[in-house]
Swiss-Prot record:
Species, as recorded: Synechococcus elongatus (strain ATCC 33912 / PCC 7942 / FACHB-805)
Gene name per UniProt: petM
Protein name: Cytochrome b6-f complex subunit 7
UniProt record similarity statement: Belongs to the PetM family.
Subunit description: The 4 large subunits of the cytochrome b6-f complex are cytochrome b6, subunit IV (17 kDa polypeptide, PetD), cytochrome f and the Rieske protein, while the 4 small subunits are PetG, PetL, PetM and PetN. The complex functions as a dimer.
Alphabetic keyword roster: Electron transport, Membrane, Photosynthesis, Thylakoid, Transmembrane, Transmembrane helix, Transport
Length: 37
């Protein structure tokens, strides 16, 4: 049970920053594309 909770917490700790970075990167790329047009 404790291992399961730790695994889930680890997933959140890893996925949340990765998701935020990915989202920011995508927004940046879209902004650059719009600026070029």
């Amino acid at each position: 049970m404790a291992g399961e909770i730790f695994g889930t917490a680890f997933l959140f700790i890893v996925l949340v920053p990765v998701g935020l970075a990915l989202g920011a990167f995508l927004l940046k790329v879209q902004g650059v594309q719009k600026a070029e047009k």
